[in-house]
Design a protein with these regions (language model features):
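TPR/TPR-like alpha-solenoid helical repeat scaffolds
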Residues: 2, 169-173, 194-206
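Structural signature of tandem alpha-helical TPR/SEL1-like repeats
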Residues: 2-16, 38-50, 71-84, 105-118, ...
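Helix-start (N-cap) detector for alpha-helical repeat units in TPR-like alpha-solenoids
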Residues: 25-26, 59-60, 93-94, 127-128, ...
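Non-membrane alpha-helical segments in proteins
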Residues: 26-37, 60-67, 71
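Ankyrin-repeat and related helical/solenoid repeat scaffolds used for protein-protein interactions
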Residues: 125-189, 193
């Protein structure tokens, strides 16, 4: 197989593969990814749909379709495609993470926690899913669970600013104000915009 020299050549190459084998889901998927890189989203969506029509177990294509739905504000569409992703491949952590994220956006916190717990069970190193799960715990009043999960994130990535911010809030809720100050300052140092009311409340504990 000849190596493509640039994106346009790669697109042409994938179109040629599809012309010779229209039922190849992988070629449709590869073409779609290249089109995404060129911000040709409508064409990419068509190719992702062709990909899953040819290869219904192509979980990554469902995730990409969900991402396109999210891009235009269609949370229900994003949720549906990610559900198809996890049904097409058992233990697909990325799909479960996206399902959890959408449920959180829709205010379905229990459903978000259920999905995100699956995401981190299937992939214990899924940093963003851990961080989103910690936020869901916090929103649900599960302070200790939020603290434990945010600390896992910090163990994996010490400079993950969102988790330092969330730890500041969780420790405040728990009455552990010195720890709250420590993580608030770390979040600020990392460039995170901590809510002014949080910073103001913590001033008394400096």
């Amino acid at each position: 197989m000849a190596k493509a020299e640039n994106v346009e050549e790669y697109v042409a190459q994938q179109r040629a593969y599809i012309a010779s084998n229209p039922e190849c889901g992988t070629s449709h998927y590869n073409l779609a990814v290249a089109l995404m890189g060129q911000k040709r989203y409508e064409e990419a969506e068509k190719e992702f749909l062709e990909a899953v029509e040819c290869s219904p177990s192509l979980a990554e294509a469902y995730v990409q379709l969900g991402g396109l739905c999210l891009q235009r504000g269609d949370l229900d569409g994003c949720l549906e495609f990610n559900k198809r992703a996890v049904h097409s491949r058992a233990g697909f952590s990325e799909g479960w993470g996206n399902i959890g994220f959408v449920h959180l956006q829709k205010g379905n916190i229990d459903e978000a926690i259920h999905a995100l717990e699956k995401a981190v069970r299937y992939n214990p190193k899924f940093l963003q899913a851990h961080a989103t799960l910690a936020n869901a715990y916090l929103m649900n009043g599960m302070i200790e669970e939020s603290i434990d999960t945010n600390r896992k994130v910090i163990d994996m990535e010490p400079n993950f600013a969102v988790s330092h911010n969330n730890l500041a809030i969780a420790y405040m809720e728990n009455g552990e104000f010195q720890l709250a100050v420590e993580h608030c300052d770390k979040a600020v140092a990392l460039g995170y915009e901590v809510a002014p009311e949080i910073r103001k409340e913590l001033e008394a504990y400096r």
